[in-house]
Amino acid sequence: MEYLAGNYDVIVVGAGHAGCEAALAAARMGGRTLLITLSLDNIAHMDCNPSLGGPAKGHLVREIDALGGQMGITADETSLQVRMLNTGKGPAVHALRIQSDKQAYHLHMRNAILGQENLVLHQALVERIKTEDGKVSGVVTRTGAFYAAPNVILTSGTYLRGRIIIGDTMYEGGPNGQQTAMNLSGALKELGLELGRFKTGTPPRIHRRSVDYTKFTVQPGDSVPWRYSFMPTQSMFWGRDVDKQIPCWLGYTTPETHQIIQDNIHRAPLYSGKIEGIGPRYCPSIEDKVVRFADRPTHQIFLEPEGWNSDELYMAGLSTSMPEEIQYDIIHSIPGLEKAELLRPGYAIEYDYVKPYQLSLSLEVRKIPGLFTAGQLNGTSGYEEAAAQGLLAGINAALRVQGKEPFIVRRSEGYLGVLIDDLVNKGVKEPYRLLTSRAEYRLILRQDNADLRLTPRGREIGLVKDERWAAFQKKKAAIAEINALWRGTTFSPLNEHLAEVLAGVHSAPVHGGISGEELMRRPEITINEIKQLIPQLAEYDEEALLEAGIEIKYAGYIEKQLAEIERFAKMEERMIPEEIVYDQIKGLSTEGRQRLKEVAPANMGQATRITGVTPADISVLLVYLEQKRRGGQIHAT
């Protein structure tokens, strides 16, 4: 029997990485928020790899932090190892990767939720979304509890009709054998949402004592304690020193490994027809790699620790859903793992997702006001992509409570904007992974300047609190002082110390006066050389120095990208009226008309990015809108 169990402003269903960020954001912005999860013991659980970051993903974590989110803080606090990737390339693709303690991460995030004002946590299984007059009115649990709210955020991850597959064995379940939400998919279909089916997987876990590490190559962390959070007081490694980091280990499969897989490929669910869902392109299973890259004799695998006090090793690169007995053979064929003890077998999981073309850029379902979806439910892969969507959905649900306009991040403002724009306008045919190559303005969207790009916007909506804002203002002031210092410092060509420093890095001698800024523009000159010449720079934080240096070195390229952004902004400003009827526009292609109706773009810029809409369609649409404007049927924008 259904009964009223409570009234809230925002209800979040699912406490994975998306749900946690959504609930915390909504509560921190003043919304009375309820977070419902299948299990209090699995909040923010890392069901797959025990790490965060890497190219584009690390950028996202920094953007989440810059806006006032939680992921970066929790990742720093519970880190096992830190590495800055791509340091041999340009700053646009420098990316932090943090190895995390799975259990510690879960506990730290749960404590953040339990300690958050305006946020209530509850364990239950949601089976229905209730609506009234076409708008969301709340959710109903399996036990009949009705929680009323005008805003509901679904962040159910891979739990919608989840099905675990290990060889010939298949059963209903979520990740790691958790219960799954079998009825919610049907409820969403009844609301008119179109769902799809995807697949993902995870590798086996082995006992660390059973590895012969002499046959692996150690992968230590960096000596610099890199952080995700821009908060200068953020601690790391559970309070341990940087030299106490736990290493990862690099190994390789062998021709024997590949032969075992090839001999049993008929038993692989991926090839036997047992798996219906489409899997992630950028994280293929080992059996898929062996088939697709048959000419390669080996593939890399990494043994990654899962915690300070855990005996489990995650086998990155060895994702599989082969039968369990074949998994033993595969593992034991790898040098150093001849006696490996299998703790958990790898598996594949199929699940339902919401096709994201049905969403607005605020992640609200267009046809059901007050209903938001975020995370893997929207067809993405990865903790970071999920958390970023959750943050945005939580922000917009809170703003809706306040009667304010949605918070939209443009492609030129952040990887978060690239992610959402791609999902809504291009859709997904496979689990979506964010890549630096998907961003047009990579040099603007660096990981080091995420706070300069987004923290002021987080402050405007009330998510960035006073302590973070003060740290941001201090960094901005430091950058201004650094710029003034090296612009105002001039060196004589007779300066012997200057000549010595230049010779040390094979930089050409100067023949006239030269400023610190001009020196910094030289490719071979780094912050280290400038600090030798201007000792006062040693007083400043390394992050502020790095930021100021990049802005000078790449000034020309940055100016070009800013000009491109300004030109494209004019298209973004050309609004498309909500009442437009695409069936009345002659000259549109059949596919273009269909896609424009599905996505309902808010402006011409968005329309140009919709898959299936051609340049000819855009020209037709522009002419139509101009004719309507001149006829007085559309207001000029």
From Swiss-Prot:
Entries under InterPro entries matching the protein: FAD/NAD-bd_sf, GIDA_C_N, MnmG, MnmG-rel, MnmG-rel_CS, MnmG_C, MnmG_C_subdom, MnmG_C_subdom_sf
Cellular-component GO terms for this entry: cytosol
Residues the record lists as binding NAD(+): 279-293
Any matching Pfam family: GIDA
Subcellular localization: Cytoplasm
Binding site for FAD: 14-19
Entry keywords, A to Z: Cytoplasm, FAD, Flavoprotein, NAD, tRNA processing
A GO MF label: flavin adenine dinucleotide binding
GO biological process: tRNA methylation; tRNA wobble uridine modification
Predominant location: cytoplasm
The keyword Secreted is annotated on this UniProt entry: no
Cofactor(s) demanded: FAD
SUPFAM superfamilies per the UniProt record, alphabetical: FAD/NAD(P)-binding domain (SSF51905)
Protein's job: NAD-binding protein involved in the addition of a carboxymethylaminomethyl (cmnm) group at the wobble position (U34) of certain tRNAs, forming tRNA-cmnm(5)s(2)U34.
Record text on subunit structure and interactions: Homodimer. Heterotetramer of two MnmE and two MnmG subunits.
Family stated for the protein in its record: Belongs to the MnmG family.
Protein name: tRNA uridine 5-carboxymethylaminomethyl modification enzyme MnmG
Organism listed in the record: Desulfitobacterium hafniense (strain DSM 10664 / DCB-2)
Lineage of producing organism: Bacteria, Bacillati, Bacillota, Clostridia, Eubacteriales
